[in-house]
From Swiss-Prot:
GO terms for biological process: androgen receptor signaling pathway; cellular response to leukemia inhibitory factor; formaldehyde biosynthetic process; positive regulation of cold-induced thermogenesis; positive regulation of transcription by RNA polymerase II; regulation of gene expression; regulation of stem cell differentiation; regulation of stem cell population maintenance. It is an enzyme of class 1 (oxidoreductase). It comes from Mus musculus. Disulfide bonds: none annotated. It catalyses: N(6),N(6)-dimethyl-L-lysyl(9)-[histone H3] + 2 2-oxoglutarate + 2 O2 = L-lysyl(9)-[histone H3] + 2 formaldehyde + 2 succinate + 2 CO2. GO terms for cellular component: cytoplasm; male germ cell nucleus; nucleoplasm; nucleus. This is Lysine-specific demethylase 3A. A motif (LXXLL motif) lies at residues 885-889. Residues 266-283, 307-327, 477-486, 495-507 have a biased composition (Polar residues). The modification N6-acetyllysine is found at K895. Interacts with VRK1.
Amino acid sequence: MVLTLGESWPVLVGKRFLSLSAAEGNEGGQDNWDLERVAEWPWLSGTIRAVSHTDVTKKDLKVCVEFDGESWRKRRWIDVYSLQRKAFLVEHNLVLAERKSPEVPEQVIQWPAIMYKSLLDKAGLGAITSVRFLGDQQSVFVSKDLLKPIQDVNSLRLSLTDNQTVSKEFQALIVKHLDESHLLQGDKNLVGSEVKIYSLDPSTQWFSATVVHGNPSSKTLQVNCEEIPALKIVDPALIHVEVVHDNFVTCGNSTRTGAVKRKSSENNGSSVSKQAKSCSEASPSMCPVQSVPTTVFKEILLGCTAATPSSKDPRQQNTPQAANSPPNIGAKLPQGCHKQNLPEELSSCLNTKPEVPRTKPDVCKEGLLSSKSSQVGAGDLKILSEPKGSCIQPKTNTDQESRLESAPQPVTGLPKECLPAKTSSKAELDIATTPELQKHLEHAASTSDDLSDKPEVKAGVTSLNSCAEKKVEPSHLGSQSQNLKETSVKVDNESCCTRSSNKTQTPPARKSVLTDPDKVRKLQQSGEAFVQDDSCVNIVAQLPKCRECRLDSLRKDKDQQKDSPVFCRFFHFRRLQFNKHGVLRVEGFLTPNKYDSEAIGLWLPLTKNVVGTDLDTAKYILANIGDHFCQMVISEKEAMSTIEPHRQVAWKRAVKGVREMCDVCDTTIFNLHWVCPRCGFGVCVDCYRMKRKNCQQGAAYKTFSWIRCVKSQIHEPENLMPTQIIPGKALYDVGDIVHSVRAKWGIKANCPCSNRQFKLFSKPALKEDLKQTSLSGEKPTLGTMVQQSSPVLEPVAVCGEAASKPASSVKPTCPTSTSPLNWLADLTSGNVNKENKEKQLTMPILKNEIKCLPPLPPLNKPSTVLHTFNSTILTPVSNNNSGFLRNLLNSSTAKTENGLKNTPKILDDIFASLVQNKTSSDSSKRPQGLTIKPSILGFDTPHYWLCDNRLLCLQDPNNKSNWNVFRECWKQGQPVMVSGVHHKLNTELWKPESFRKEFGEQEVDLVNCRTNEIITGATVGDFWDGFEDVPNRLKNDKEKEPMVLKLKDWPPGEDFRDMMPSRFDDLMANIPLPEYTRRDGKLNLASRLPNYFVRPDLGPKMYNAYGLITPEDRKYGTTNLHLDVSDAANVMVYVGIPKGQCEQEEEVLRTIQDGDSDELTIKRFIEGKEKPGALWHIYAAKDTEKIREFLKKVSEEQGQDNPADHDPIHDQSWYLDRSLRKRLYQEYGVQGWAIVQFLGDVVFIPAGAPHQVHNLYSCIKVAEDFVSPEHVKHCFWLTQEFRYLSQTHTNHEDKLQVKNVIYHAVKDAVAMLKASESSLGKP
């Protein structure tokens, strides 16, 4: 991986430079400059603090610089392209350069260095450039041929650990790049962050401000500055801005800033408090300011009488305010005020696309980086360095701080012991009367039976309380908590967040018990424990604070602190108590039996809460994902069984609008996890197991790094507290209900707990009873299986008497010699089976076998592969709603001599082989697909077949029977296409002219599809001007040829509905298969997630790009090979055929033919005169591992490295051209679907299916994601894969919450079936 932004120039502000002028050297010009003595030339060095404009190619470019060795007061503006200036070099990227070894001078080694790039070269440098080796202050000159790009960042980190100075600087470079990336993007996650803005006022160098809004469209920040109140908008590309960090903390084998994993519903899954960015080292000295006209910053620096040079760039003059940019609410400063702002960050030389890091720990000590535990891990790219001699403390970057009034409040009822006086609401009473809740409410323990009563817990909390004892007066407590928003016990059925606005409805205020002097007095007299109902910062200062509250309390501006307690990790979790002296202290934590009706009602199948589904849908969902749910429950039970009997399990109730995430791997926490009782640090089961296993074996835990506790103490696994989110035994109760309902409705169960004799869902005793259910007598579950070479675990289903025999004695149940079905053994078991209700086989011998529990194979040999918690639910399982023949086939498996299991034979593939027009046993021929004929399925749905009868194409997007036919192919993991949608859409809304008119002035990033280089400083109008006009396109610098561009992340993030409401409505009203694709679709499992939770962002998202028409362009992709965690429907809403390009049709036809398209597709283009937009290549999800192995093989052949935390598919670094596709088919037998997407076509891509896109003409595509019951298994696999990606991958964070989605989908399906039992006479 090369840490650079390609060949494009990033921003100049904050970068080091070298300048050479004729006035400072020999007279006579370039001829007198001797390259042999280039190091002796009179170079001047320094730092760029501001620029006149962002276009570095314009000859009027001026930069404000501070020269090394001079005071910052002597800063000045210089003309980069002046006549006297002979060279101007700026820091560009990180490379490896040869140098003599510091230890062994006669040895030449490769050393990381920052390379300078020539912005101006009139001195004849040519191939000579300057580099500065990390750890050195001086620059040297070397030939560019001696420089090598850095391919393996992780190996480099490990090699630098012995040199603390170099290691720290290397770490600081990465962090500063992350800072710069978010500042330049106008990232909304910076809201609430404190920043330093460079000032051109002679009296000060910097001034402080707080970010109150980020505008990704205009890439500007709206700030609140006390020193200059009129300053509202800042452009970090023009003036130096730094994010202020007050603290660094060392995390295991790397250093990271503290990360807040609580998610706000206000921005649908983005971090409420993202990782703080590091500030640069003490700024170098600088020089006097020359007065410059104010036209440079214009509206970008409102109210500032800028001291910067004028700009001749027409874009910088009189630019109207971009759409959706913050309102201009600042008045100009009075005359005489010359405060200004510029950034100071070191060069952003790094090319990792950063994900916004999150604020993590709050404390650090000197010397942490020198410890062995601080060595950099192979999978972690977020490395921070500790500045010398200081301990800086981070400020939280919170989304909610600028929206205090709209912060989501927890709509939760407080447990009974929370208030001394009894309180109840009508909603609580209504819920309590629900029959499903009666037995749960009867088991709710008394207030005296809690975690604090156990001696083990009290011993652990004593140290926490020793420093917190302080006499508390009621009035004092009341004043401290006066800003607390009251929580509501009323069940709120409204969404936490609507996409049409960024506001959330604040529930009616309810004050903390500590604000009521009478209640406080009663609590002091009785000594009764109560639940913390306010944030830590509003309680007594001496009590231990959680990580969020600790960071929040460090903010200098108290007005900007969060006033909502929901982001406190101890809110509605920790128990407090007044001792006999009236001192408030920590008493313990809630336990699973302390729930109330509202808390338990969120997790139980309550019939009155089920909307938007029907009986058939509920049966179908349960048949498809019921087994996955069972595996999930088994995994939770296994994890619970590993907890020592004497350990207490705490209960952390779900908080509305907050998503609990693992502080280590960013995975959404479903239920069981481990929490630090001192700071609230939380880790998932997988990370806990991995850490504990490594600690026991004495190995370094390098996969993920753990942040530190208060006072830099290490989080040891044995000191963490097991905690569950689902109250009581609700999880196991729902598991029992699932089996009961499936039995009553005849829904087949193929999960390991199908045989009830093993009682896998026997509910473990709650830990507050200090009892642990023994697991003796239970058969091994899927959690004991060891992964094979493939990350996908394949099930072995052996039924009947074979279940009791050793696995080695199992005989193949079907012949392997001449059967025409033997080819099915080569298929993976990942496909969901298709229903077969038409044929019922009478096989009494097999009837009992079908219902047996498939035993698990023993471990053939000790495995070194760590088996993770999630892997127990990654095993593909068959569809339960199937006929006897399918169950027979799924239950009949064979073992090879070496103990490996053959894949089950799948009924759907048998059908596929029987209905083909022609069959052949020749493996070299293309496999034919399943041709679903209306006469066979009983449907009358217009459709035809593409890709040699392997791709279903539905012709009527509004046909009510589409989803029935669609489902038959979708089950098998096949993509599907629907045509004719453009006839339903409002075409005027999707034309380029409408986008240009509405958004033309917005500033965006563009990507050159041929080079993947990022082009900054362009506008939306620049892109649309060349959309259908080749001569009017932006041209590259070298050949001055029109570039093939695509809009990068536009509209940004989740802004599609807000920016384009009419287009959103038009799309949602006409998108085909609304049962799957609409947000409220009955087969879209994401719709089952209650509004109580943070909803995942599933789009829509736009993809706008020019076409790649020339023969040379066939090796490039508009979107390289990648895969997505969710299903997607991609709609071609507009195809633009550009002017000024000859022989377009001939080249497009050749590209279609070269792309392996079939004859019918070519006929659509030639005879049907349809507009082809894009060429897709989609591969089956089951072939992902083969494709990954192939790409790694090719990269090794090309001399490229394969870092452990990177992936050739997830990196999106490959496009498979014809030669690579041919090799993939010949060497690995992998063939995909070559699909040409015409205007109005909708391509449905299954979750986990690798795919790539090559635009034939200029295209506007819109994609909507969804979660279908047929492909949930791929979501599991991908979520586990993404945990191991580097922190800079956009897919690293688990935003889908697949476990929560499955749980609530099953819960609602069960509720619907139970509600229908009485009407259908079910007992």
